[in-house]
C-alpha cells in the first residue's frame, strides 16, 4: 500500500530517550517531564525529519472533484434539461422590492433629503411656490403626483 519512500520517520521525544538509544520508562513524578527541550536535542530531532520529494500531489483538488461529480449526474427528464438551459441563458437577478429599496443607501439619503425639505417647508423656511409632493414610497416610485389629481377633481366640479 504505502511505498517506503512515503513513510515518515516517527518523532522521538528526546526527554524519554537515553543517550545510548534505549528508551526509559515514563515517570509521572519526574521533574524532567516539565522541562523545556534543549537546543541540542531539538537539532537532533529536526535532523531526523525529512521532506519526501517523491510524494506527488493529487491530480484534482477536492472542489474540482465535487464539481466533476455534480456535472456527471445524468438529467432525469427532458423538462429538467430545458429548464436548466433557460436558467443558464437568464441568470438569477435580484428582485427590487420595497424592502430592498428602503435598504438602498442612496435611495434612503434621497428620501431623507426630501423629508428634510418638507419639514423646512412646513416651518416656513423655504419658499411656498413649490407644489405639494407626497413623500411616501408609492407616490415616489409610481411617479404619482397627488397635486395633479387634486386639480383634476377641481376641474370636474366646475
UniProtKB/Swiss-Prot annotation:
It comes from Rattus norvegicus. It is found in: Nucleus; Cytoplasm. GO terms for biological process: embryonic cleavage; epigenetic programing of female pronucleus. Residues 1-38, 54-78 are annotated as: Disordered. Residues 26-35 have a biased composition (Acidic residues). Residues 58-68 have a biased composition (Basic residues). Keywords: Chromatin regulator, Cytoplasm, Developmental protein, Nucleus. GO terms for cellular component: chromatin; cytoplasm; female pronucleus; male pronucleus; nucleus. PANTHER family: DEVELOPMENTAL PLURIPOTENCY-ASSOCIATED PROTEIN 3 (PTHR31577:SF2), DEVELOPMENTAL PLURIPOTENCY-ASSOCIATED PROTEIN 3-RELATED (PTHR31577). InterPro entries: Dppa3. The lineage of its organism: Eukaryota, Metazoa, Chordata, Craniata, Vertebrata. This is Developmental pluripotency-associated protein 3. Primordial germ cell (PGCs)-specific protein involved in epigenetic chromatin reprogramming in the zygote following fertilization. In zygotes, DNA demethylation occurs selectively in the paternal pronucleus before the first cell division, while the adjacent maternal pronucleus and certain paternally-imprinted loci are protected from this process.
